[in-house]
């Protein structure tokens, strides 16, 4: 269980409890306004995540309000192409979560807009890293949404955007902070998610517990 004060004690980062599901639902709906409704998680989904893998569900709280949340499951390294809905068993994780899996798949993270820019997402990644270490897992794996594509979608394809992003020709408001937090690029995942502003794409990345570990070794 994680329960720690962060940012000079003004926020609490902790393992999610059953009573947090409604607050997590609010964070989800607020943070992903362009995501198709069929891919938005609700309190019932979050309740199931907490029931199945409580250690992997985290929240950030301030003055009694949930202002950030992160959802994960355990799995084996995904060798094949997959979609967001496939990765999390249509949001429920019941069949996707493998209790003996050696990777942590982070399939959701959000921080309310008025609390962004303070490093809360980085704190959540650090906490997930702590959970990975405690459970003896290999790494976190995520599919970061290419949020920045929406601003340039009239000037380039999503494929070109990902190629240029991978060459560090520009930054992305989601992918760049994730890389700065320690994640390593694997590959773009096209048609991964139903979000036109992201070009329906995400970047598959991993953050190993042992920094000497590299995929393909």
Residue ranges and their predicted role:
Residues 9-11, 65-69, 104:
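Glycine-rich phosphate/pyrophosphate-binding loop shared by adenosine-nucleotide-utilizing enzymes
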Residues 11-24:
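A short beta-loop-alpha structural element at the N-terminal edge
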Residues 15, 26-41, 49, 212:
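Helix-loop element at the rim of GNAT/NAT acetyltransferase active sites that forms part
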Residues 16, 109-111:
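Hydrophobic adenine-recognition pocket in adenosine-nucleotide-binding enzymes
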Residues 35-77, 86-95:
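Active-site rim helix/loop that mediates acceptor-substrate recognition in acyltransferases
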Residues 70-108, 126, 142, 146-173, ...:
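Conserved acyl-donor/pantetheine-binding loop and adjacent beta-alpha core of acyl/acetyltransferases
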Residues 111, 117-132, 139-142:
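Conserved acetyl-CoA-binding loop-helix of GNAT-fold acetyltransferases
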Residues 138, 184:
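Short acidic/polar active-site loop segments enriched in Thr and Asp
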């Amino acid at each position: 269980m994680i329960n720690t004060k962060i940012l000079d004690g003004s926020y609490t980062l902790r393992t999610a409890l059953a009573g947090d599901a409604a607050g997590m639902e609010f964070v989800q709906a607020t943070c992903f306004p362009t995501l198709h409704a069929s891919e938005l998680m609700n309190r019932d989904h979050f309740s199931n995540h907490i029931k199945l893998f409580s250690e992997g569900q985290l929240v950030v709280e301030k003055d009694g309000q949930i202002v950030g949340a992160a959802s994960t499951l355990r799995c084996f390294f995904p060798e094949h192409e997959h979609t967001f809905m496939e990765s999390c068993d249509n949001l429920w994780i019941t069949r996707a979560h493998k209790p003996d899996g050696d990777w942590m798949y982070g399939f959701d993270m959000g921080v309310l807009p008025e609390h962004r820019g303070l490093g809360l997402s980085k704190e959540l990644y650090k906490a997930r890293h702590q959970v990975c270490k405690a459970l003896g897992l290999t790494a976190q794996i995520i599919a970061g949404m290419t949020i920045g594509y929406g601003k340039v979608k009239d000037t380039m394809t999503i494929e070109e955007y990902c190629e240029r992003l991978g060459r560090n020709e520009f930054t992305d408001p989601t992918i760049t902070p994730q890389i700065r937090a320690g994640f390593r690029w694997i590959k773009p995942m096209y048609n991964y998610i139903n979000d036109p502003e992201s070009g329906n794409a995400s970047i598959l990345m991993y953050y190993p517990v042992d920094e000497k570990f590299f995929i393909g070794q």
